[in-house]
Amino acid sequence: MGRHHYADRTYTSFDPEALRDVVHQSRIEHRLLGAGDLEIRVRNRTGPRFAVGAGDYGCAVYAQGVLHPGALTISLAPMRRGEVFLNGRPLPPHALQVYAEGASIDYVTTHAACWHTVTVTREHLQAHAVGRLGRELAVPGAGCAQFEPDPALTRQVLEQIETGYRLASEPGTDAETLLCCDLALLDALTEALAHAPSTPEPRGARTRRRIMEVVESVARQGAQSAEIDAAALSRLCAASERLVEHAMRQGVGMPPKRWLTMARFNRVYVELADPGNTRSVTDTALHWGFNHLGRFASNYRAVFGESPSDTVARVRGEPRPRLTARVAATVA
């Protein structure tokens, strides 16, 4: 993964394109799920053996994508003000999720939250585990597995991650010091994963994921999703309306109608933020199924922190600063 490099970026308005690379060697799509503090801080540290990333989100967010095709990705979200769901499963604050190479991730936070990821090759992690424990770790060969170690072990992982960020941000830190920090993080990860067998999926998880996939496929239909009522969604999911509602609340923390509405709001935002867009705000809102324009404008401002016309003006005129590089340090 190259030399040691550290970057600390703060976004002061929602920029889904800039957020696509928040996890090392991954492409992650972002959608806002409600009103909140739009400031998003992203930190990334890469070294010769693995990469570490962190996102501090002040608002409810949905992030979906495919992770590094050639490495394991280990995620945790120890600090949050609401609920956090990963792949339709609630994530306890002390839990770790291990994703196999190229696995898909669906991340939902219902309020402000901070997540961390460690990207490391399977070979390097297992070699370290054999050297430390005398055996390999039971990590998944495909998909994702959730581990729930003692909270003290999770705190040690988090402390080593934060120590690495602090050292990488200091100009005088040399490469040898960072390598020692990397080894300490691998030690902490190995201990946490070794002493926490993966937890089985809760009852009904497969049905819940299937329903979530159907609802998300409807959301991706765009404007047509505005015409889908609860009965139609129930038929598409081949499940009762009550089960569809329950599955969405258990898997993403909100009912299906709100999920579909927020997906359409995000599509409007992406279109208005496109410099090549030629449709008016009114035509764009109507196209995406928002017929009550006053209510639409009010809700849009609450979610994105600006009016629809402000979005258009910002894109067509001089864009206001959306990215602030707080720290960027490279150590040979």
Regions found by a protein language model. Give the residues of each.
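Short acidic (Asp/Glu) patches
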Residues: 56-61, 77-82, 99-103
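Generic hydrophobic, amphipathic alpha-helix propensity
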Residues: 211-215, 260-265
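Short, conserved beta-strand element in jelly-roll/cupin
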Residues: 66-82, 118
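Short hydrophobic/aromatic patch on the recognition helix
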Residues: 244, 248, 295-296, 300
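Alpha-helical bundle regulatory/interaction domains
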Residues: 1-37, 83-224, 229-241, 250-255, ...
